[in-house]
Amino acid sequence: SIAASVLVLAVRSLGGLQPAELRAYDRLLQQRLPNTTPERLLVIEATEADINRYGYPLPDAVLAQVIERLQPYEPRLIGLDIFRDRPEANSPLAPLLAEQDNLVGLCSGRLGQGDGIAPPPSLPTERLGFSNVVEDHDGVMRRHLLFMTPEVDDPCATEFSLSARLAIQYLDVEGIAPQILPDEQLQLGRAQFAPLQSHSGPYHNLDHWGFQVWLNYADTETFVQQISVSDLLTQNIDLESLENHIVLIGMSAPVSNPTDFFLTPAGANQWPRQQTEGVLLHAQMVNHLLTAALDGQSPIRVWPVGVELVWIAAWCGLGGLVGWRWRRLSMAVIAAGGSVLLLYGIAWGLLNLSWWVPLVPAAIGATLATVGTFASA
């Protein structure tokens, strides 16, 4: 048991188990119990059919029509998830961006060798959010970048992501303001968000720049309504009141705009892999913040490193006990399998309570301890 614990912890400390731990997390995430999400989001998406109809990039006049079509329904906020760094001459969109207080626009921060993308010139900084996201080495979006400090000459001079800007302005109407606590956690309404560190959960030597947290996904089929640009502008769609809604306007055109698609844990578990359009990813991020702040849906949390070590060692001890207790091979195999199933059930149950626990290292350690103890005896 001791040898199994040392071996597993050594391999894990070097990051050798990170890919398997992340894949196990993806699987557990998809198996969680369904959760209900209040209707607060609407996505207006420019589909491939819309691009064929109106052109690419979507003209300012069309975007202005979309915004003006929405305003009578009094949405609390409109987030424009489309870059507009090069305004058209006599653009009807420019005065809307300058004057409509419920309109939030987009830019892209300068990272690494990139140049960044400037915001619309007429948009005030206090209604601006960056589009930058963080993905893991396997390309899957498991983390949520809320804030980052822009460089001095960055054309995207905002510390807020688009999702954080929209959520915080939405919550401001509810009388909720963000607070940074002494332990550097973010207090947002009923929720506290702990920033990821270099060794958080399955991550080892994580580049945790900015303020990153786990992204707690909602059920993809139920959390947001989607309407195409053409349907909004040409059909008699009754949106009723959007008073308590955030409307996101973005692209959903994989041929015309292929770079704005991302791999989520749900898509990574399908074959072939299914990517999600960027506007829906931003909607997931906004929903993540609002459901935590308003509905008490806890952000995903991890144990301190010391508690994880005790957890893994305990399962190694249980595996050793199984190998010592059952001397018939068939019984030892059944008992070891039952232990792993019990471990999986506990990990699943805790993730439903928004706690991630080390499933893979505990399962490997328990199995190695069972085999080693059985063989030595």
Where are these predicted regions, by residue range?
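Non-transmembrane functional regions of envelope-associated proteins
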Residues: 1-199, 242-328
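Substrate-access "cap/lid" subdomains that shape
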Residues: 179-237
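Pore- and pathway-forming membrane helices of multi-pass small-molecule/ion transporters and channels
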Residues: 273-282, 337-342, 366-367
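Short, well-ordered loop/turn and helix-capping segments at boundaries between secondary-structure elements
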Residues: 291-295, 347, 369, 373
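Juxtamembrane or sensor-core-proximal signal-transducing alpha helices
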Residues: 360-377
